[in-house]
Swiss-Prot record:
This is Succinyl-diaminopimelate desuccinylase. Its EC number is 3.5.1.18. PROSITE patterns: ARGE_DAPE_CPG2_1. The keyword Heme does not apply. It catalyses: N-succinyl-(2S,6S)-2,6-diaminopimelate + H2O = (2S,6S)-2,6-diaminopimelate + succinate. The gene is dapE. It comes from Corynebacterium glutamicum (strain ATCC 13032 / DSM 20300 / JCM 1318 / BCRC 11384 / CCUG 27702 / LMG 3730 / NBRC 12168 / NCIMB 10025 / NRRL B-2784 / 534). Keywords: Amino-acid biosynthesis, Cobalt, Diaminopimelate biosynthesis, Hydrolase, Lysine biosynthesis, Metal-binding, Zinc. Belongs to the peptidase M20A family. The keyword Nucleotide-binding does not apply. InterPro entries: ArgE/DapE_CS, Bact_exopeptidase_dim_dom, Peptidase_M20, Peptidase_M20_dimer, Peptidase_M20A, Succinyl-DAP_deSuclase_DapE. Its cofactor is Zn(2+); Co(2+). Zn(2+) 2 binds at D103, E137, H345. The active site is at D79, E136.
């Protein structure tokens, strides 16, 4: 028997300590049961009057029902990418290292702590919903937030959603959309010494490659924020042997687009710009795609957070995050958490502990009278 079993999660204590406890519970995607159990137990053991706690698969949800004028959702995923010899966690010189420290157990810890400390406070300004969900780091059809949307949509009702992805304590508003298109060229195989008997599939892609290389990406201003689009070839493959004209070539295009376009508009833009339709021997197909999320900074419920963070610390989110799911449901959504996202998924994943404290203080200021 292990005589050094750690106590359950202390949601009311220091969010830095809570972050480290969460990090030290391994939870790669698909293996979230233990961390979901501990989060659920911690919430139920608080016995907060008037607070509803609900378990759905490995998603843990909680909400207040105080009849306040507006509702803010605090959402964070509980899974991580596969562990890369970076557990257990450690803290050195004010930096916490370990799998999930930045993506996104620091943000999750802050949201759990904030919910636990304010749910029954007389100073609370907005009703709160807490969503701790599974399988964000893997295929879309496994995403816990999507399952909640499909099976229990009433739990996602809110005037504003905050997602605890790492932002360095800044507000990263909305997110860009993400589109991947596979373009395939068909030719005729032949010996390279008699190339005129064949039809080089790779050469058929070359005009499209040239158009992508010459593409001038747009910079789009929305609510005073600049979103930067990008169209790139991210994978290309062809070839049979060094003396064979290839009869097949394909490439993947990735288009990151500003949230003023929806997914269908993004597809249409790429197809028209690259003239993919009507080319002999060329076919294309959408491999994956998701629309972005508008920033929603003009909402009244958002103004207090902007004041607490500071207007000089607001920027556009260039990557795609689950705020897109909230936007699709008509809920304004912002990314707000601790840490530098460039350390996500790395062996040296890390988060400054000071930022955990700062983000918790900002959230308390925003949500309290």
């Amino acid at each position: 028997m292990n005589s050094e079993l750690k106590p359950g999660l202390d949601l009311l204590g220091d969010p830095i300590v809570l972050t480290q406890r969460l990090v030290d519970i391994p939870s790669p995607s698909g293996q979230e049961k233990q961390i979901a159990d501990e989060i659920e137990d911690a919430l139920r053991n608080l016995n907060l009057p008037g607070v509803e706690v609900f378990r759905f698969n490995n998603n843990v949800l909680a909400r207040t029902n105080r009849g306040l004028a507006s509702r803010v959702m605090l959402a964070g995923h509980i899974d991580t990418v596969p562990i890369a010899d970076n557990l257990p966690s450690r803290v050195e010189d004010g930096i916490m290292y370990g799998c999930g420290t930045v993506d996104m157990k620091s943000g999750l810890a802050v949201y759990l702590h904030t919910f636990a400390t304010l749910a029954t406070s007389t100073e609370l300004k907005h009703d709160l919903t807490l969503i701790a969900y599974e399988c964000e780091e893997v295929a879309d059809h496994l995403n816990g937030l999507g399952h909640i949307r499909d099976e229990h949509p009433e739990w996602l009702a809110a005037d504003l959603a905050l997602l605890g992805e790492p932002t360095g304590g800044w507000i990263e508003a909305g997110c860009q959309g993400n589109l991947r298109i596979k373009v395939t060229a068909h030719g005729v195989r032949a010996h390279s010494a008699r190339s005129w008997l064949g039809d080089n599939a790779m050469h058929k892609l070359s005009p499209i490659i040239s158009k992508v290389a010459a593409y001038k990406a747009a910079e789009v201003n929305i609510d005073g924020l600049t979103y930067r689009e990008g169209l790139n070839i991210v994978f290309c493959e062809s070839g049979v042997a060094n003396n064979v004209i290839p009869d097949l070539a394909w490439m993947n295009l990735n288009f990151r687009f500003a949230p003023n376009r929806d997914l269908n508009e993004a597809i249409e833009h790429v197809v028209e710009t690259l003239e993919l339709d009507g080319q002999d021997g060329i076919e294309w197909a959408v491999e994956d795609g998701a629309g972005g999320a508008l920033p929603g900074l003009g909402q009244q419920v958002t103004s207090g957070l902007i004041d607490a963070v500071g207007r000089e610390k607001i920027r556009a989110k260039f990557g795609w995050t689950d705020v897109s799911r909230f936007s699709a449901m008509g809920i304004p959504a912002l990314n707000f958490g601790a840490g530098d996202p460039s350390f996500a998924h790395k062996r040296d994943e890390q988060c400054p502990v000071e930022q955990i404290t700062d983000v918790a203080a900002i959230l308390k200021q925003y949500l309290s009278e």
